[in-house]
């Protein structure tokens, strides 16, 4: 029997954490049986970086404005996103609009003004995804209901709910809209009882795997606050960890 082939559906391989050994990370990724990585952009400034990296590594990419970057985003950036999606519309490595969405966790993003701006950019990017007939990769952090409302108002051709950690009812609502749910390193923690139970309640066809590298390290890479205070760095996640996470 052939070994399984994996796809890391969400990893930020353009991040500075990989600047010193990006080629080695890529080699380990392929050696581990991860045949493809999807590299989402987070702001206009890294659109070209993720595109070039995806081509250099024979991976895939997505273009979008992450909710954490909406405070400094402008309508001109939306025009640049629209132009980039049009310019690369025949590029088979461009697979989605993302990472977009809503973040209900970061306090400074949840003032009335900041939340309204998040909503504006989320809805505008859904319209771009609709226009360009692309799926979306959505950031879901304490925001599932708001994301679902946007998707019902502006239907798109499916996508992935990245790092999903909502309820079974919310999961089923995303699935009904043509979405897959992304699971990764968070599942590896013994305390993640609710998330593990949710994963067992979903059909396998609704689940995709991801690392969110360099973030969301699995338990074997995690260092505690005490360890970090003592000088140990936080473990860096990378796509080669995906088979063990699975």
Where are these regions (language model features)?
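Mid-domain alpha/beta scaffold segments of enzyme catalytic cores
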Residues: 1-246
């Amino acid at each position: 029997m052939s070994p399984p082939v994996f796809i890391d559906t969400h990893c930020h391989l353009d991040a500075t954490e990989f600047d010193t050994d990006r080629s080695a990370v890529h080699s380990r990724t392929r050696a581990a049986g991860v045949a493809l990585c999807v590299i989402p952009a987070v702001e206009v400034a890294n659109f070209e970086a993720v595109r070039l990296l995806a081509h250099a590594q024979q991976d895939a990419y997505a273009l979008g404005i992450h909710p954490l970057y909406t405070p400094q985003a402008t309508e001109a950036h939306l025009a640049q996103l629209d132009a980039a999606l049009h310019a690369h519309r025949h590029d088979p490595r461009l697979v989605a609009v993302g990472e977009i969405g809503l973040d209900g966790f970061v306090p400074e993003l949840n003032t009335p003004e900041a939340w309204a701006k998040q909503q504006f950019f989320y809805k505008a990017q859904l319209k771009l995804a609709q226009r360009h007939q692309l799926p979306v990769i959505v950031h879901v952090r304490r925001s599932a209901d708001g994301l679902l409302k946007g998707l019902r108002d502006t239907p798109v051709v499916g996508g992935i709910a990245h790092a999903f950690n909502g309820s079974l009812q919310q999961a089923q609502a995303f699935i009904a809209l043509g979405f897959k749910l992304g699971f990764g390193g968070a599942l590896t923690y013994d305390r993640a009882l609710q998330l593990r139970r949710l994963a067992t309640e979903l059909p396998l066809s609704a689940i995709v795997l991801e690392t969110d590298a360099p973030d969301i390290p699995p338990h074997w890479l995690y260092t505690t606050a005490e360890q970090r205070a003592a000088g140990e760095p936080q473990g860096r996640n990378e796509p080669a960890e995906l088979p063990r996470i699975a």
